[in-house]
Regions:
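Single conserved hydrophobic/aromatic residue that forms the stacking wall/gate
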Residues: 1-6, 10-13, 211-213
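Conserved donor-binding/catalytic core segment of Leloir-type glycosyltransferases
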Residues: 27-49, 55-58, 70
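Nucleotide-activated donor-binding/catalytic signature segment of Leloir-type glycosyltransferases, i.e.
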Residues: 82-101
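Short hydrophobic beta-strand element within catalytic cores of glycosyltransferases
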Residues: 138-141
């Protein structure tokens, strides 16, 4: 077992890590017009992940931009409700609700989408955000939990979760050259949250354990 001191070092220095080889960067010149979000469709989770606000932002954008939103995630007790909400707004041509997808499919979506949307009300670490960034995707999210520590200045932090705010930032950045943000996003995850960084942290813990014995 780790000593108390070593355990403290491990918790402090070794956050979640990403396989940055598997989650490699997809260049923006190869990306299309898709938006992507991952959200398990449980009733509380769709509120936490602001899924209805994301859907409403698509309604605001559909006549301005040629874009399509893909929603992935385990089917929960709000799945049918979300499908109905999309249908009643006449957005079936603009939004696909995919349900559960494989990791291979997730990687394809992350490497081909224009923006990854996760404007949450609260988060822990924000693992999906880190995975998206590692794939070089420009993330639109909020300053909650540890998200700002993950994103830094290599993504788009919005001030609130209103549909108008989400829609405005997508429209503002849509025609920008996003390659520099993409490069910065992957680089940040590779530097701070890669498996190589985790291995280094573990070695530091081992050294700490050695020093305490």
């Amino acid at each position: 077992a780790l000593s108390s001191a070593a355990s403290d070092v491990y918790k402090r220095q070794s956050p979640h890590c990403i396989d940055t080889v598997k989650y490699s960067r997809g260049m923006y010149c190869n990306r299309g017009n898709e938006l992507f979000t991952i959200c398990w469709t449980g009733k509380e989770n769709v509120k936490r992940k602001c899924l209805y606000e994301i859907i409403d932002s698509v309604e605001l954008l559909k006549d301005k931009l040629d874009m399509h939103l893909n929603i992935a995630g385990h089917k929960g007790d709000a799945f049918d409700e979300v499908k109905k909400y999309i249908s009643e707004k006449g957005l079936n041509a603009y939004i696909s609700i995919l349900g559960e997808i494989s990791e291979k499919e997730k990687l394809c979506y992350l490497k081909s989408c224009r923006f990854y949307l996760q404007p949450s009300r609260y988060e822990g670490f924000g693992l999906a955000i880190a995975e998206a960034m590692s794939c070089g995707t420009v993330v639109v999210t909020t300053d909650v939990g540890e998200v700002l520590n993950v994103v830094g200045n290599a993504g788009i932090i919005i001030r609130n979760t209103l549909p108008e705010t989400i829609a405005n930032v997508i429209e503002d950045y849509w025609n920008n050259d996003l390659e520099s943000i993409s490069i910065a996003a992957h680089s940040r995850i590779e530097t701070l949250f890669s498996m190589a960084r985790r291995e280094k942290d573990i070695m530091n813990v081992v050294k700490t354990v050695s020093y305490t014995h």
